Amino acid sequence: MPNKPGLWSRLVDYLGFGPEEDEFEDGELEQVQPAYQEEPPRRSAPERRGQVVPISAVPSKQGTVKVVVVEPRSFEEVQTIVDQMKARRPVILNLESLDKDLAQKILNFLNGAIYALNGETQRVSAGIFFYAPPGIDVSTMGRGLTGTAIGGGAVDLPPGVLEKLMGTASGSQEGDLLARTARRSEEGDRTGADRSKFDWRNQ
């Protein structure tokens, strides 16, 4: 005759203090592996830096640096000027003969372009500006600096411009350039013909 559980045992079981029985037998438990997989180490994206071009790419075989001189007549010519900047050619921009609105529009565009190229701009005189590509220091080039027009041909550079850029302008050369600009301004004031021209003295 099977032994009946005693009153005490039944009370303990009723209250939940009895011996716990495993619901699973040995061997029924499965080892659960984590579902994730290790990812291969990622390489950080290379840092984008401005393009650095050595200065040795500019001098020609004769040891001179070709400076492109431009006197634009329309805004459509700015693309050609920017192409010269992108090719790392120094540019002298002459805006003396343009009206105020067109000159300012061209100047703003080219200033933005040379900034994007990490170059520098320098005002030479009233209406004349110099754009240097990155890595080009005109003051260290010596006198081996010549002017050339887009498409070739002779260039009539304003007196003293290149010398002033190199820091070697004499008083007479620079004075001639400034005097010529002053004469043009005075003639425009007298005749009223050039009142629409840009006031470069405020730039």
Curated annotation (Swiss-Prot):
Keywords, ordered alphabetically: Cell cycle, Cell division, Cytoplasm, Septation
Origin: domain of life: Bacteria
Subcellular location(s) per record: Cytoplasm
Any single Gene Ontology cellular-component annotation: cytoplasm
Record flagged with keyword Phosphoprotein: no
Record flagged with keyword Cell division: yes
Start and end residues of each stretch annotated as Disordered: 26-51, 167-203
Coarse class of the protein's main subcellular location: cytoplasm
GO BP annotation list: division septum assembly; FtsZ-dependent cytokinesis
Biased composition annotated in UniProt, kind: Basic and acidic residues: 39-50, 183-203
Family annotation (Pfam families): SepF
Family classification: Belongs to the SepF family.
UniProt cross-references to PANTHER family, sorted A to Z: CELL DIVISION PROTEIN SEPF
Primary role: Cell division protein that is part of the divisome complex and is recruited early to the Z-ring. Probably stimulates Z-ring formation, perhaps through the cross-linking of FtsZ protofilaments. Its function overlaps with FtsA.
Oligomer and partners: Homodimer. Interacts with FtsZ.
Protein name: Cell division protein SepF
Species the sequence originates in: Symbiobacterium thermophilum (strain DSM 24528 / JCM 14929 / IAM 14863 / T)
